[in-house]
Amino acid sequence: MSKNKAHITVNDKKIELSVRKGTLGPDVIEIASLYKETDTFTYDPGFTSTASCESKITYIDGNEGILLYRGYPIDQLAEKGDFLESCYLLLYGELPTKQEKIDFDRCIMQHTMVHEQFARFFHGFRRDSHPMAVMIACLGAMSAFYHDSIDITDPQQRMIASIRLISKVPTLAAMAYKYSIGQAFVYPRNDLSYAANFLRMCFSVPCEEYKINPVLTRAMDRIFTLHADHEQNASTSTVRLAGSSGANPFACIAAGVACLWGPAHGGANEACLKMLQEIGSVERIPEFIARAKDKNDSFRLMGFGHRVYKNYDPRAKIMQQTCHEVLKELNIQNDPLLDIAITLENIALNDEYFIEKKLYPNVDFYSGITLKALGFPTEMFTVLFALARSVGWVAQWKEMIEDPAQKISRPRQLYTGYAAREYIPIDKRVN
């Protein structure tokens, strides 16, 4: 390979391909001309070696354990800023000035109300419906309630839709939770912070005044920030794929929520908590460690390893600290699940098997314990993930729509089915 070119030979035909260099990360070989030049496609199941787009939003270095939003390390954003500051950063590319932050916060909080007909919309679901099923429906329904902001060719409508999604998803998520437990919906309060408002909508009841706890509010805000974006993962790619067809933003985000519901993607923290409950006690950990190492055993240690990170997940360190702060604030001492988690973490960081396979604790490892301590049932965990990730999806969708090189996505395939064959009348068919 030359400095800016790659050469490939297919069936004795040699072609030259351009090599593009990003700000960070591996170089990328442009293969758009490959089919035209050689009548061949590339084959990359799961897109593990394929850059599907050009983006300026989020960067991950899995080998070094680095996650950047617009160039800023995730730990600095989570510890020094707040979620809406990260929202502004992801949407506009720069951290806001003091006045820009005030104006943006006010804009978001002024749009937290949802159409009153949504209350009746919820009553169309069974009470025991999974909150993610309800969220998918609600996000799709937003295009019916807010059809004045679905023209993707209008920059003003794109921005209005973006603001509405970021501001209203917490309200819909809280309504989904309240509906599932048979309690009255709680209207948002615009004088509260984003995280405090969400916690109040989830946990306040008419019979007593809800008191804002700054430690729990800060924990919720950090969880939102840590999950705001994560490059071109399955759900983000789904949003981009749907958006490439010209679908309205509400439909695209609903598609992202549907993808996130998959247990291999957004359900990891719920699965991790269930695993800790299955282990039950510190004394049983060796048994489950042995099972995890046994290739013939289907058991997997959830919360360890990551498809991208081959080092310690930078979000996990902040999540661990946040978890301890919440447990201390709520005076949860000697929590058996936390004891199991800490013991498992120590084993993973010192056991040769885990070190060799680079199975480090990820963000899901501690987030499940934290969310449980905050009072959320496991069915709400992925809903909270979707709430936080909405801003990342919106930023990625907006970037894609505004890219002049954008075109409808059309993946290819390696076809291994039958070649053309003649139709056989039904009375002449045999097994």
From Swiss-Prot:
Residues of the active site: H306, D364
Keyword Protein biosynthesis applies: no
GO CC annotation: cytoplasm
Record pathway: Carbohydrate metabolism; tricarboxylic acid cycle; isocitrate from oxaloacetate: step 1/2
Superkingdom, natural source: Bacteria
Keyword Transferase assigned: yes
Gene Ontology BP, a term: tricarboxylic acid cycle
Keywords: Transferase, Tricarboxylic acid cycle
Reaction(s) this enzyme catalyzes, per UniProt: oxaloacetate + acetyl-CoA + H2O = citrate + CoA + H(+)
CDD domains: EcCS_like
Gene3D superfamilies: 2.20.28.60, Citrate Synthase, domain 1, Cytochrome P450-Terp, domain 2
EC number: 2.3.3.16
GO molecular function, one term: citrate (Si)-synthase activity
Family: Belongs to the citrate synthase family.
Miscellaneous section: Citrate synthase is found in nearly all cells capable of oxidative metabolism.
Protein name as it appears in the record: Citrate synthase
Organism listed in the record: Bartonella henselae (strain ATCC 49882 / DSM 28221 / CCUG 30454 / Houston 1)
